Amino acid sequence: TFRTKGEGGCMEATLSQYRDLLMDAIDSGYIDIVDVEYFSDMEIVDEVIAEAHSKGVYVIVSNHDFKTTIPMEQIVDRFKSIIFTGADIAKIAMMPEEGSQVVDMMQAAKELQECGNQTPLIVISMGELGVETRTTGEMYGNTVSFATAGIPSAPGQISVDALRSQLTMIHHIIAGK
């Protein structure tokens, strides 16, 4: 993953630098999965996906908003648009301003799951408000979570040990154990 400054990363990159970096990573033969930002440029997104798939590399198409969370219907539409690119995994991470926006993120994933979506989703509400999206994903169709083994790389990340404990507890509740 190379996260551009526009989506919360630390470094600026021109579109051609961003494209070249991703293509070099794909062509290196050393990666299994690459993350391409949905709003970088559709031509680049399409090109990266095609190259990655031709080399047997999986693709996460992602969108990050560190300022706010869009309404639930727009989250669903954005996920559908990301899925339509041919992404192997669709990811949206947004910053909630209130608890109802966290619920919107989870409900959007659940709605897609109930409509038969087969593309794995990564659904994250960042910050302290959004911690539950990192721990209860199994309940609403989130397939991946992120934790920290040290310094968090995004707001709201919890330690690996805390996440493991929470995921185990939620799984046992769902499984009726």
Spans of features found by a protein language model:
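Active-site beta->alpha loop and helix N-cap motifs at the rims of alpha/beta catalytic domains
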Residues: 1-54, 64-68
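Catalytic alpha/beta core domains of metabolic enzymes, predominantly
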Residues: 38-177
